[in-house]
């Protein structure tokens, strides 16, 4: 008997009813999109969201956006794109083990860093200093996905995906810090922490800025002595603690206190030795200088931006239009513009 197209999506939704725990998010129970659409014949709503993000221009640009080390340092360092893929992989592993919606996790993970600026967090710091209302990449990710992509139409993603992206950032468990309303969104937040702390250590060791022996022994004894062991420890702990939470009626993703403290301390070590350390300061300052100059140039010459961003200037103001243009740039494109604007091309007599 042939299976009609409509039943293909229904088959997936039927499987979700069996495989996803009651506390998880089933596709058929979505809170919907800002603009209502007809359902896809084959894919669930979260599969559609995942595919829209993957096929977006903003997603493709992540391959040329720095994670920590600018690509001129070598070919094997993580980019914002490879970081995103690692977050998705870790998140799906955690989600599958708990019994959550893997498609929702994947969509949130793939979109979580869409709003990041060129040159990693140095770029974010520049825009945060220059813009009257500050700048946060998670909020910008939502703006890119809802107001910038598809020439201003946005991708019209589900509320679950947008909420997970908005709340993925931060390293705090304070009660006043809001969290994603789905467990899937909370999984991505933890997966992001697990991924970036560990792969930044791996890249720093590859760059010769750290050695395994430099890592605090008390933390390594808790988390593991190498990259794969640490990820294994953190993933298993997140799964077990979350299942324990659910069993006790606390519907939230988490880690055991011992493991989470160790992860936070390892992140603190990375801030002191790498992210804010003296070794990379010169490179950070160069990146910031480039962004400052390009931003200020377009503040004075907004008429030289593409028409799309000039329209934003007219509708939402000069700073917003320039910020949208700058925040979408890859490292390569930002450097190209800097050279075109400020570096002479011919000898002047």
Curated annotation (Swiss-Prot):
Keyword Metal-binding carried by entry: no
SMART domains with a match to the protein in the record: HDc
Domain HD: 80-197
InterPro entries with a match to the protein in the record: dGTPase (IPR006261), Diverse_Catalytic_Enzymes (IPR051094), dNTPase_2 (IPR023023), HD/PDEase_dom (IPR003607), HD_domain (IPR006674), PHydrolase_assoc_dom (IPR026875)
Record-level Gene Ontology MF annotations: triphosphoric monoester hydrolase activity
Keywords: Hydrolase
Keyword Hydrolase: yes
Family in the record: Belongs to the dGTPase family. Type 2 subfamily.
Protein name (database record): Deoxyguanosinetriphosphate triphosphohydrolase-like protein
